[in-house]
């Protein structure tokens, strides 16, 4: 959830500015403080850090006045110790010769800290990170090289960590170590980089290497070295040619990660959905991995669909289509609850793991635990080379481009169209659909980008108007049946995430079993009416009878018997195809959430207490 970056330039004194630009590209991960460390000539390690927003800290601490070619930077999301200036990264050793930034959680930090303090080290922060600098200091003091110190560190630390480190003894290098926390190396012209995320290095590098668990090494202006541990406790460099084989070219431009004139990333990404859908759909239907994945799903003894947050909701939608089209009764699993299902996992189990970043901690823990019991894994991710990509037997890639806003929008619909396509293919593999029917349904999905485009245009004004009326609301229901109930869950999450209005989603048929007790005059209820469940109008009517303000969001060609007093927002027609309902209906709720946040004075890109990529437990 923190973000780290390290840069080594061949010439100039602009590393501080470049670090700040890279950290700004990591803001989407969530943070409460930031800092940098730079080696200034002729040989001085300088740290500037504080709690607060990047721009504020840069101004307050004089970050841009630092001069040097090599440095590291960090945005912190507090896990050990409150957000304050002392706990902000980077952290240094007793002598001020080693600086470290870290993403992850060190599980055995308490015992390590006690041991270090007993040996005379003075640790000033409450973080689990600071002890890394002191351990390195000890190893160097015993005569080990920095690489040997990193190797020892990897054997001592328990938990997850991506580390970038500076050492005054080698002022042209940034060292790194990675275990269970994402880290990439960027290769540029006259500059090399290491960072939590490809997005952070786009200004300086387009060729990247995704590091694997246990790997460590260094970057300098002239080159990169990567080492891996051996079973005997030693380590070795990657074999000749292996480094070059792992280099991947990134086609994203820096501009694609900017706001492109929109006031917020969230709004930009809502409007990017037609393109993201087109590229994801075109990519998946041409990907040979689709049929491999479909064969696994069709032949599964049991199927688990696992994800967290929005990715879990996409999994619910995928589960709906797998059941309806392929007759496959899978189990949707909230990733943090995966241990409940572990006793039933064996070699007959197939797992569909959904994670936009491919680095979601709970999802990866489920995948690793279940793979250890023989399960085969299909990964669904937006990031090539991510941890999920590497863990999966088969990976199906979103092609949505970078998503910066913390609240997922375009990746939800991209995940949806990918899982719909997988469901159709699995139905074909299972013999539930003929080849002609498979082609016909796949052809229906070709209309998804246009349905989303028209839905966005149809929703903008209505969502803005509704937000102005609802900005003072304290709570609302968003309900639906069948597919609509699943879309309602994602709609409610968006409203909660960015506007801080409590929104509860549940299957509409459950109203009389408890939730309707909260309905009183003026209480807001949204009803998601999908092509499979026009009977949901009965639930809308019973809410209206209790005085609720009811708005039904439905495709314009869905036949509904609507009594007076219930508002119906007519979205683009779907021709009765439930396959197109998500693209006709979801954008309204995304825009409603966005405009509610803005109307209430909140930044929808940076909701409080949340992070884009949750890489810790």
UniProtKB/Swiss-Prot annotation:
Catalytic residues at: 2 (nucleophile), 612 (for fru-6p isomerization activity)
Question: What is this protein's gene name?
Answer: glmS
Q: Give me the reactions it catalyses.
A: D-fructose 6-phosphate + L-glutamine = D-glucosamine 6-phosphate + L-glutamate
State the InterPro entries in the record.
GATase_2_dom (IPR017932), GFAT (IPR005855), GFAT_N (IPR047084), GlmS/AgaS_SIS (IPR035466), GlmS/FrlB_SIS (IPR035490), Ntn_hydrolases_N (IPR029055), SIS_dom (IPR001347), SIS_dom_sf (IPR046348)
Originating species = Aeropyrum pernix (strain ATCC 700893 / DSM 11879 / JCM 9820 / NBRC 100138 / K1)
Q: Give the molecular function GO annotations.
A: carbohydrate derivative binding; glutamine-fructose-6-phosphate transaminase (isomerizing) activity
Q: Name one GO biological process term.
A: carbohydrate metabolic process
**Domain SIS: from-to ranges:** 293-432, 466-607
Subunit-level organization? Homodimer.
The name of this protein is Glutamine--fructose-6-phosphate aminotransferase [isomerizing]
Q: Where in the cell is it found?
A: Cytoplasm
| SUPFAM superfamilies linked | N-terminal nucleophile aminohydrolases (Ntn hydrolases), SIS domain
Enzyme Commission designation: 2.6.1.16
Q: What does this protein do?
A: Catalyzes the first step in hexosamine metabolism, converting fructose-6P into glucosamine-6P using glutamine as a nitrogen source.
* Pfam families the record matches: GATase_6 (PF13522), SIS (PF01380)
